[in-house]
């Protein structure tokens, strides 16, 4: 009877940690325990570790930890790539060893044995394409084409030279300090791919996210059908109601069915929960990057716009204060976060994305990059 509550507690703690890690820096959580958990996970735990190592082992050990940090965070390395391969390989191996014996089953066709292999193979192919394809490196040879392809908007992108590459930096490009190169239509540096995500490989990255979301969802659903088939074939509900006199209702059957499943099929339950959580996280990333593609925006540009809007708001507030105007504070952070109303000063701050050409053309630009079109080649010859 205590097992379901244990699962609820485990799920609640997991959800709190995930939400704190991903969303703890949102303004809505400022000053709350969610922000404090986020700070501990992203900075605090590491700083405490450094202090502990320094106190226990001295400067040499501390410098060693800092060297490992530099290798892992400031230079290209395959650590997360290896971790990804290990996660996929170990998870699929466990599923084959523990769950393929139930395929075919009451609700699951034997075809899924082979579909799973194809699904994992396609995921691995997308991983390789994203990891090892050129993200759109800007060089002295092609910089003129990129300068023509993306105009400067004069707000978040202004004409300037890359201080490292010593070439003009096109609009939407950024110099990646990890890869040490300028990348056109820079989105972000992805440690999982050990590669930048830019103009030429955003399509592979988005396809990778969507496909892995579908794989995890598919795996969780199939495992659920396996468990449902086992309940049906073993007549668990019938035995509980007829032989043990359990009330034939959800509230009466659930604790006993859950106990039986955890006792007999705990591996399948853990795998299904794991895949469902990963699918939920990937679904969020898919939605976010789909939104970026539809609006022809990148992660880097999103941060730039946030910084610009915050700067403009600060300027407006200073002007209002200088003019003796008093702005009423919102009643709460939650209302401020979800409210659609804006103050007079806020309405003057407009995000003017000149690269947004409509959803269809935006998606075409992602999946058929400008640098792979004939017009781009003609600019080179000109």
Curated annotation (Swiss-Prot):
Q: What residues form the membrane-spanning segments?
A: 3-23, 76-96, 114-134, 206-226, 236-256, 269-289
Which terms does the record give in the GO molecular function aspect? protein-cysteine S-palmitoyltransferase activity
> Pfam families under this entry?
DHHC
Q: How does it sit in the membrane?
A: Multi-pass membrane protein
Top EC class, one word: transferase
- Give compartment(s): Cell membrane; Endomembrane system
Could you tell me the keywords of this UniProt record?
Answer: Acyltransferase, Cell membrane, Lipoprotein, Membrane, Palmitate, Transferase, Transmembrane, Transmembrane helix
> Which InterPro entries does this chain map to?
Palmitoyltrfase_DHHC (IPR001594), PFA4/ZDH16/20/ERF2-like (IPR039859)
GO CC entries:
endomembrane system; endoplasmic reticulum; Golgi apparatus; plasma membrane
* Enzyme Commission code: 2.3.1.225
Q: Which residues form the DHHC domain?
A: 160-210
> What information about domains appears in the record's comments?
The DHHC domain is required for palmitoyltransferase activity.
Function of the molecule: Palmitoyltransferase involved in the positive regulation of salt and oxidative stress tolerance. Palmitoyltoylates the salt tolerance receptor-like kinase STRK1.
Tell me the protein family, please: Belongs to the DHHC palmitoyltransferase family.
Q: What is the name attached to this protein's record?
A: Protein S-acyltransferase DHHC9
What is the organism of origin for this protein? Oryza sativa subsp. japonica
Taxonomic lineage of the native organism = Eukaryota, Viridiplantae, Streptophyta, Embryophyta, Tracheophyta
